[in-house]
Amino acid sequence: MITVEAFKKYFQRDFPFLPTEYEESEKFNYILDEDIEKAMGEMKALLPVSVFEDEVLEIAQMYLTAHCLVGDIRRSNQGLASNFTFPLQSRSVGSVSESYGIPQKFLSSPSYAYYTTTDYGLKYFALLYPRTRGHVQTVTGWTLP
């Protein structure tokens, strides 16, 4: 299982973590250890541990925790969260344009739509989805003649 310190190291460029020296009045401008611990608790409730190989499990835990953390922070900033839009579908700058869409079957699914609300959730979903389709396990054994 991941730790707060491991999470901070993995996402050191992604989040403004609380520095060791800070003014008390600026404390809530940063991500606190308590915020990460809360998100880790949510991750534990959502993560299907048995689906992931040992080498991938920690990465899945990191991205699902980050997804939960972003959702928690957005919800705590009520006004900001109320105007959230889904990930980019298309944009143009001059003569250059890009577009993509999240397939409707994911957006319509109560199980999957939640993961499409942040980039971290999409990254986690990219790890999860292929492991939940056509997943086969074999069991060795024999029968008596």
Positions of the model-derived regions?
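Short, hydrophobic/amphipathic alpha-helical patches that form generic packing surfaces
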Residues: 59-74
